[in-house]
Amino acid sequence: MLDEADPSEDCDRTRGLVDLDRLGQWMDAEGLPGSGEEVQATFVTGGASNELFEIQRGEHRWALRRPPRMVPEGRNETMLREYRILRALADSNVPHPAVRAVCAEPSVLGATFYLMDFVDGWSPISESHWPEPFDSDLGARRGLAFELVDAIARLSRVDWKARGLEGLGRPDGFHDRQVDRW
């Protein structure tokens, strides 16, 4: 959780990956709210896969997702694909953060990134203990599991073709191809 992070590490990660002046200029060009307000960034989580920052400008909060400092091959395209999928889920009943803007121009932050609404929460994968009531109440954990299943079921009902998601891969024979990867 944020309050457990080392503040010096947060500052180093933010300084090296989020140029606040360039980000603010880009946000202004995109017409995002808070023009003229100071942009602040706080490291949330990341590592080898992708980095996540909380971005604040005035009363507005977003999450910025970007590749790590050393951008692996293909990662910029992955960011664009993630943005495309989240954007396609707009107005669906699938729980997801609304995306606000994407930047594929490396001169802004050195890699492709996107901004989405900030959602307060926690990751059961990256936390050593879960917040209450999930840490001690098995009924709450059970309810959380059912919410996860419900979200996956909702996602499975999305008409991905009608939402413009063709071209993300080969849907035919997907499961059969996975067996060879095991």
Feature-to-residue mapping (PLM):
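Juxta-kinase regulatory segment immediately upstream of eukaryotic protein kinase catalytic domains
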Residues: 2-34
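ATP-binding pocket architecture of kinase catalytic cores
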Residues: 38-181
